[in-house]
Amino acid sequence: MSVSKKDVEYVAELARLEFKEEEKDSFVNDLNKILNYMEKLDELNTDDVDIVVNPYYIENKYREDNVEKSMELKEVIDNAPESLEEYVIVPKVID
């Protein structure tokens, strides 16, 4: 598998990026070097290796996960800078 200039232009268009021609050529070269290096993985013999979906079986080792009483709605609304009925009004962060 190799990356062409057309591939780089397509991904750049998806990401809404613009590159000079020499930058595109550099990306093609760099990406092909990376892919060629990754092809070395095909040489590995993994017949005797067990399949592992997730090597890190994470457990909560720090504390028990206990349910605790939270603040009453009235207390939350009273402490909010701005509210409407039972909703806290916050500044808009997404267009």
Swiss-Prot record:
Keywords: ATP-binding, Ligase, Nucleotide-binding, Protein biosynthesis. InterPro entries: Asp/Glu-ADT_sf_sub_c (IPR036113), GatC (IPR003837). It catalyses: L-glutamyl-tRNA(Gln) + L-glutamine + ATP + H2O = L-glutaminyl-tRNA(Gln) + L-glutamate + ADP + phosphate + H(+); L-aspartyl-tRNA(Asn) + L-glutamine + ATP + H2O = L-asparaginyl-tRNA(Asn) + L-glutamate + ADP + phosphate + 2 H(+). The keyword Protein biosynthesis applies. Its EC number is 6.3.5.-. It is an enzyme of class 6 (ligase). Gene3D superfamilies: Glu-tRNAGln amidotransferase C subunit, N-terminal domain (1.10.20.60). It comes from the Bacteria. It holds the Pfam family GatC. GO terms for biological process: glutaminyl-tRNAGln biosynthesis via transamidation; regulation of translational fidelity; translation. The keyword DNA-binding does not apply. GO terms for molecular function: asparaginyl-tRNA synthase (glutamine-hydrolyzing) activity; ATP binding; glutaminyl-tRNA synthase (glutamine-hydrolyzing) activity. Heterotrimer of A, B and C subunits. Belongs to the GatC family. Allows the formation of correctly charged Asn-tRNA(Asn) or Gln-tRNA(Gln) through the transamidation of misacylated Asp-tRNA(Asn) or Glu-tRNA(Gln) in organisms which lack either or both of asparaginyl-tRNA or glutaminyl-tRNA synthetases. The reaction takes place in the presence of glutamine and ATP through an activated phospho-Asp-tRNA(Asn) or phospho-Glu-tRNA(Gln). This is Aspartyl/glutamyl-tRNA(Asn/Gln) amidotransferase subunit C. It comes from Clostridium botulinum (strain Hall / ATCC 3502 / NCTC 13319 / Type A). The lineage of its organism: Bacteria, Bacillati, Bacillota, Clostridia, Eubacteriales.
